């Protein structure tokens, strides 16, 4: 008798995706982040659903409704901080997942990679709109500053901003629509995840060596299910520790002050996971130029497959490219730090230098070093 998991119309889809899926035998822990992101998305949707039951998207009551959740709802404080810090954990896993893809050449699966970039944009949009909902000072001013960037678009900019705001400033209409989209987008993200996995399972996984592993496959279950569960435990332990011991570590104290359009905070900044892009935006004195640089800082990932000049897929055997990769990581940390600093000397020049290096490494140095490595290996 054939096993039901191989014959049942629904179970066989799950079986071919998570049980009998052929996987390379050499996958390291860097391949855990896909499943960790799935867990993060699940946690965010669940906690968000329960928070939405108590939240009111009205400028007069939004801030108080969040206070009510924390003080009066059973374990409301836990839901709120799991959701807020869950977003941070989501982005940590997301950036590590993208970094893994860059290091090991996973971007050569162009469909999977491009859907991944769409996912990154969708998650960033979701997180931005979520940050506006508590209606604290940083929520209000962050929404004002970031949405106002669209006014840099020629001809239609001003009308576009007012259309998004639903008026002449960030107000009740803006908060209501942001809440609606913040609720909707995670489900669109979940649908995109299915497409991402569909394309991935068409080609099969890459592996650390970058060498085709067709002759050496093992079933996903039990080998990688156990490995993934260990990853879940480590990540959930880290998230629980953050939530229970230091829930406000990654937040901004200004967001505990109710939104006041008449009082601008001394330093407007987004959440920590957007600071690198915010630093690139600020490093260009021209508004339109800054907005283009901001978009390109993420969109540049789409042209990485075109810039791949090496005869080898992975960086595992390319020490010069490895040095450049880790320099890029250091620059991203520098940009994150600069994004959180005030706009004054010496931070301005450090931000501009780091921004230029960020684009130079990806666009020029990486392809040039790859060609040099090809030559050194006489290929």
UniProtKB/Swiss-Prot annotation:
Q: Where does heme b b566 bind?
A: 97, 196
Its required cofactor(s), as named, are:
heme b
* Transmembrane regions: 33-53, 77-98, 113-133, 178-198, 226-246, 288-308, 320-340, 347-367
Can the keyword Membrane be found in this entry's annotation?
yes
> Do you know which InterPro entries this protein is assigned to?
Cyt_b/b6_C, Cyt_b/b6_C_sf, Cyt_b/b6_N, Cytb/b6-like_sf, Cytochrome_b, Cytochrome_b_C_euk/bac, Cytochrome_b_N_euk/bac, Di-haem_cyt_TM
Query: Which GO terms label this protein's molecular function in UniProt?
Result: metal ion binding; ubiquinol-cytochrome-c reductase activity
Explain how, and how many, cofactor molecules are bound: Binds 2 heme b groups non-covalently.
Superkingdom in the source lineage? Eukaryota
Stated membrane topology is: Multi-pass membrane protein
| Locations listed in the record | Mitochondrion inner membrane
Q: Which residues bind heme b b562?
A: 83, 182
Q: Where does a ubiquinone bind?
A: 201
GO process annotations (BP): mitochondrial electron transport, ubiquinol to cytochrome c
UniProt cross-references to Pfam families, sorted A to Z? Cytochrom_B_C, Cytochrome_B
GO cellular component, as recorded: mitochondrial inner membrane; respiratory chain complex III
Keywords per UniProt = Electron transport, Heme, Iron, Membrane, Metal-binding, Mitochondrion, Mitochondrion inner membrane, Respiratory chain, Transmembrane, Transmembrane helix, Transport, Ubiquinone
> What does the similarity note say?
Belongs to the cytochrome b family.
Assembly, per entry: The cytochrome bc1 complex contains 11 subunits: 3 respiratory subunits (MT-CYB, CYC1 and UQCRFS1), 2 core proteins (UQCRC1 and UQCRC2) and 6 low-molecular weight proteins (UQCRH/QCR6, UQCRB/QCR7, UQCRQ/QCR8, UQCR10/QCR9, UQCR11/QCR10 and a cleavage product of UQCRFS1). This cytochrome bc1 complex then forms a dimer.
Q: Please tell me what else the database record remarks about this protein.
A: Heme 1 (or BL or b562) is low-potential and absorbs at about 562 nm, and heme 2 (or BH or b566) is high-potential and absorbs at about 566 nm.
Role noted for this protein: Component of the ubiquinol-cytochrome c reductase complex (complex III or cytochrome b-c1 complex) that is part of the mitochondrial respiratory chain. The b-c1 complex mediates electron transfer from ubiquinol to cytochrome c. Contributes to the generation of a proton gradient across the mitochondrial membrane that is then used for ATP synthesis.
**Official protein name in the record:** Cytochrome b
């Amino acid at each position: 008798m054939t096993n039901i998991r191989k014959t049942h119309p629904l179970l066989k889809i799950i079986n071919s995706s998570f049980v009998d899926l052929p996987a390379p035998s050499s996958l390291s822990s860097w391949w855990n982040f896909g499943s960790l992101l799935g867990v993060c998305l699940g946690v965010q949707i669940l906690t968000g659903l329960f928070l939405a039951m108590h939240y009111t998207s009205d400028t007069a009551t939004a801030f108080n409704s969040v206070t009510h959740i924390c003080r009066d709802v059973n374990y409301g404080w836990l839901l709120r901080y799991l959701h807020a810090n869950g977003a941070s954990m989501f982005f940590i896993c997301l950036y590590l997942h993208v970094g893994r893809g860059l290091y090991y050449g996973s971007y050569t699966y162009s469909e999977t990679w491009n859907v991944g970039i769409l996912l990154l944009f969708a998650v960033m949009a979701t997180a931005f709109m979520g940050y506006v909902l508590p209606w604290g000072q940083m929520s209000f001013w962050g929404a004002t500053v970031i949405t106002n960037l669209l006014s840099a678009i020629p001809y239609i900019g001003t009308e576009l901003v007012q259309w998004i705001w639903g008026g002449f400033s960030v107000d009740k209409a803006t908060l209501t629509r942001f809440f609606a989209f913040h609720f909707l987008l995670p489900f669109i993200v979940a649908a995109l995840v299915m497409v991402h996995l569909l394309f991935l399972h068409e080609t099969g996984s890459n592996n650390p060596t970058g060498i085709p592993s067709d002759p050496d496959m093992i079933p996903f279950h039990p080998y990688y299910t156990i490995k993934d569960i260990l990853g879940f435990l480590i990540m959930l332990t880290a998230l629980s520790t953050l939530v229970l011991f230091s829930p406000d570590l990654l937040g901004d104290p200004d967001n505990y002050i109710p939104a006041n359009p008449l009082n601008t905070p001394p330093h407007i900044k987004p959440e920590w996971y957007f600071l690198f892009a915010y630093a690139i935006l600020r490093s260009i004195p021209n508004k339109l130029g800054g907005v283009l640089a901001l978009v390109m800082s993420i969109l540049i990932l789409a042209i990485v497959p075109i810039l791949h000049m090496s005869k080898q897929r992975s960086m595992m055997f390319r020490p010069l490219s490895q040095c450049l990769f880790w320099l890029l990581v250091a620059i991203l940390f520098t940009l994150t730090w600069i994004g959180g600093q005030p706009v004054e000397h010496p931070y301005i020049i450090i931000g501009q230098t780091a921004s230029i290096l960020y684009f130079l490494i990806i666009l020029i140095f990486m392809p040039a070093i790859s060609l040099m490595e090809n030559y050194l290996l006489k290929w």
